[in-house]
């Protein structure tokens, strides 16, 4: 079972057949909630009855969750008070149940001074369920309002109306991903928003680039780690350097940046080195789009107060990027700074808009028994990653590889 309030994990418990998962609505959540998109199989309302105890009072379709299954897991459906008003997901007995347990306190209305209930969505145990969590919470808050206004849930007379609501929600969310409920003067709109897949893991040698101007946002809007690392995210510093300069543990920095990537405010780039080789792709978009070429001219200008570089000059620079030609060689030949072009910002803009891509080097040890750094030359670890892991300069690694006749370099 996992639980969380908003985007922060609150409690995590494992007991018997109930599995432990990682709560959250951001990066990491999608994988934890299952691997396949699945329909809502059932919607039910459970409540704690004054004499009968924990029971299902309304269910669509009827008896989808059997009494035996419910009896085995009901301690997690109507949990202790500290787990109320937060999403709980129970994965047991071939079903996954997403709920939002609630307790309404009122000594005059209720026999036990409180009305405890939980609205639950049920899907297959291996189905992804994170997209249902905001809907469960919103519908639960709607039912809380209805209960406080007219005892809509606790009155037996209203159970048929509740069943009609569940039938509508189940059908419309499965078929159209949206549902509208009109009950008296109250209307509620529900919509399933599909979550993006998790971004790939962030590594030490990756370079984050801000895609939105977050520095202008009040720092109070961000968690402590983001506040600490934000000043060091500039499209040049790699993750390990950001962690060192911000004095934040590297794993925390990676987690924070992965979250920013998930929300689309950060893009990961390769380390910018003058020994890098780049290849062009989709370069025609720079010429075809006036707005894009205008943005590029402003972004790459070495001195924005001077005449902006021409699109033709920028295009010439990008078009010179080809296999076997380093950034250093291009700069020596074209002298971009003489034309008010900052070559580093030009590379960043090209990577960001996918005009160019970096060709990475992967050393491969071809001898019999590797030793020392040779153990890293597997063909799976890039040159940049090796430099970051060892703390050695690219020149040192280059010399090391050139002297070793048992090492071949693959470019890809």
Curated annotation (Swiss-Prot):
GO cellular component: autolysosome; cytoplasm; GATOR1 complex; nucleus; Seh1-associated complex; vacuolar membrane
Disruption phenotype: Pupal homozygous semi-lethal. Under nutrient-replete conditions, larvae display a significant increase in TORC1 activity and adult escapers display a small, but significant increase in body weight and a reduction in climbing. Newly hatched males display decreased tolerance to both complete starvation and amino acid starvation, likely due to decreased triacylglyceride (TAG) storage and the inability to down-regulate TORC1 activity and activate catabolic metabolism and autophagy.
Source taxon at top rank: Eukaryota
Compartments it resides in: Cytoplasm; Lysosome
GO BP annotations listed: cell division; cellular response to amino acid starvation; cellular response to starvation; germarium-derived egg chamber formation; germline cell cycle switching, mitotic to meiotic cell cycle; meiotic cell cycle; negative regulation of cell size; negative regulation of TOR signaling
Keywords recorded for this protein, A-Z: Cell cycle, Cell division, Cytoplasm, Lysosome, Meiosis, Mitosis
The keyword Cell cycle appears for this protein: yes
TM helices/strands, residue ranges: none
Cited InterPro entries: NPR2-like (IPR009348)
Role of this protein: An essential component of the GATOR subcomplex GATOR1 which functions as an inhibitor of the amino acid-sensing branch of the TORC1 signaling pathway. The two GATOR subcomplexes, GATOR1 and GATOR2, regulate the TORC1 pathway in order to mediate metabolic homeostasis, female gametogenesis and the response to amino acid limitation and complete starvation.
Subunit structure and binding partners: Component of the GATOR complex consisting of mio, Nup44A/Seh1, Im11, Nplr3, Nplr2, Wdr24, Wdr59 and Sec13. Within the GATOR complex, probable component of the GATOR1 subcomplex which is likely composed of Iml1, Nplr2 and Nplr3. Interacts with Nprl3.
Family membership noted in the UniProt record: Belongs to the NPR2 family.
Protein name per its UniProtKB record: GATOR complex protein NPRL2
Lineage: Eukaryota, Metazoa, Ecdysozoa, Arthropoda, Hexapoda
Protein encoded by which gene: Nprl2
